[in-house]
């Protein structure tokens, strides 16, 4: 702060951001093509204000069909990637519900897995019929600091819950949980384009930037 007071012109604040060139053009070329077709230009890649031109297309049935087809194709691609890379059997016809972010108490991955446990318990107790729920696949992606014991315990909990749920025939095809290891850019570029529902439930006032949802 002292240096900033003396040399204010030498300091600037740049928050976290997301590059559309990587997370749309490179990671999601199908969506990129649909956007370019809808806008009639690819200049949106360097001027995201142009994306406002998509708003009227939300009521265009043909555009919506193309958008939905892109999402389904991406889900199939991710399912194949997950099988090849991790041995996971992910059904691309289920809703893919993701929570990808640094593992931390304030980001509340523990709260999310507790909600999954509650849903599972409701099905097993007969309180809710498995046939009445939206078939969903929950995918966690995260890393924890080496010495962060509670975060490591949360990862263990998620994997233990996944092991139970994924091997229970009562919820087969209705509820599945996966935690692919070593979350990295390769996984992000395959998972994010396939995501139907992205969870952002960090404790209010704690999230510094929150770029995961932008991707």
Give the positions of each predicted feature.
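Catalytic cores of carbohydrate-active enzymes across secretory and cytosolic contexts
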Residues: 1-215
């Amino acid at each position: 702060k002292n240096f900033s007071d003396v040399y204010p012109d030498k300091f600037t604040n740049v928050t976290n951001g997301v590059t559309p060139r990587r997370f749309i053009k490179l990671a999601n070329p199908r969506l990129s093509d649909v956007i370019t077709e809808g806008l009639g230009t690819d200049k949106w890649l360097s001027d995201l204000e142009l994306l406002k031109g998509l708003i009227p297309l939300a009521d265009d049935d043909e555009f919506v069909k193309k958008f939905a087809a892109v999402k389904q194709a991406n889900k199939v691609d991710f399912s194949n990637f997950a099988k090849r890379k991790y041995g996971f059997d992910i059904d691309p016809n289920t809703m893919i519900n993701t929570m990808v972010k640094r593992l931390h108490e304030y980001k509340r991955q523990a709260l999310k897995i507790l909600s999954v446990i509650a849903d599972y318990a409701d099905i097993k107790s007969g309180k809710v019929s498995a046939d009445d729920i939206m078939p969903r696949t929950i995918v966690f992606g995260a890393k924890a600091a080496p010495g962060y014991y509670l975060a490591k315990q949360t990862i263990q909990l998620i994997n233990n819950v996944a092991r139970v749920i994924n091997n229970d025939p009562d919820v087969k095809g209705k509820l599945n949980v996966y935690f692919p290891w070593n979350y990295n850019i390769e996984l992000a570029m395959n998972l994010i384009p396939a995501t139907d529902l992205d969870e952002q439930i960090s404790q209010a006032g704690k999230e510094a930037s929150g770029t995961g949802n932008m991707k």
